[in-house]
């Protein structure tokens, strides 16, 4: 515990290095500032803002809903040991780290971030297909592949949507753009994680009690129900983000000379 506290202190001190300097000429009390409502109205009048936020919310929810049920699924349905289920988290994190590297490579080449985000959603569809079919095939390896691809697809989607937000013509409202991204991302993620657990519990209770029919009397039914919802949410994400790819035909100018994990606020 003391080691964690000391590490946190050191990391916070390091984070203060090169912190953005104050700009009194922009933050003085004498400068007239519009209300949040006026600022948001101006910001939302950009044609693709609301569609972007809807796509972000759907995609984030799709990748987050499985967060607290992935390991129990491996243990309860596939009979994995405690150590084997712990590895699932490592696989998901490894997939996300690999996605960050891939995103850095292609975004620095000015690839359309919306297109890359849609590719992340496609990987998510493949991931949940692997997870869903791992139960009838009794294949822990297929399940592990699904866990890895969830991290990879989610990583691509998160970084790409953040880069897209940073590339908005915000007219001096960069903080609002990133704040909107963070608010939608955090809200969608929190609601989805909670909903995933509740849906799994409710459906599992109904299924094991026989209220859903004899064919669905299985411990896997509740989990499968959640994974199918995520599957459909990813299709909805593709529908929402598709027009953004069309609207953004020209390559997006790279918004930063560097790309790293420090650019991902969550």
Predicted regions, residues:
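A membrane-interface helix-boundary motif in multi-pass transporters
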Residues: 1-5, 201-233
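Juxtamembrane intracellular "pre-TM" segments in multi-pass secondary transporters
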Residues: 20-53, 256-266
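Short amphipathic helix-loop junctions that connect adjacent transmembrane helices
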Residues: 68-85
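Intracellular juxtamembrane helix-capping segments at the cytosolic ends
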Residues: 156-170
């Amino acid at each position: 515990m003391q080691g964690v506290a000391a590490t946190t202190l050191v990391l916070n001190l390091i984070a203060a290095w090169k912190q953005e300097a104050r700009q009194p000429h922009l933050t003085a009390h004498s400068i007239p500032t519009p209300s949040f409502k006026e600022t948001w109205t101006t910001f939302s009048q950009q044609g693709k803002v609301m569609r972007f936020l809807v796509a972000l919310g759907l995609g984030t929810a799709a990748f987050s809903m499985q967060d607290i049920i992935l390991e129990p699924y491996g243990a309860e349905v596939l009979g994995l040991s405690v150590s084997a289920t712990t590895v699932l988290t490592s696989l998901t994190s490894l997939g996300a780290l690999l996605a960050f590297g891939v995103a850095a490579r292609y975004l620095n080449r000015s690839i359309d971030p919306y297109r890359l985000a849609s590719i992340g959603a496609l990987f998510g569809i493949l991931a949940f297909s692997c997870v869903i079919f791992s139960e009838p095939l009794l294949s822990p390896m297929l399940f592990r592949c699904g866990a890895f691809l969830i991290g990879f697809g989610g990583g691509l989607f998160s970084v790409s949507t953040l880069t897209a937000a940073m590339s908005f013509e915000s007219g001096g409202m960069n903080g609002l753009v990133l704040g909107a991204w963070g608010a939608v991302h955090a809200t969608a993620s929190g609601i989805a994680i909670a909903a995933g657990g509740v849906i799994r519990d409710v459906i599992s209770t109904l299924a094991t009690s026989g209220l859903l029919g004899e064919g669905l009397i299985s411990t896997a039914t509740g989990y499968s129900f959640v994974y199918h919802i995520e599957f459909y949410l990813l299709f909805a994400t593709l529908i929402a983000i598709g027009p953004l790819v069309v609207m953004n035909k020209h390559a997006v100018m790279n918004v930063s000379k560097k790309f790293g994990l420090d650019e991902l606020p969550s």
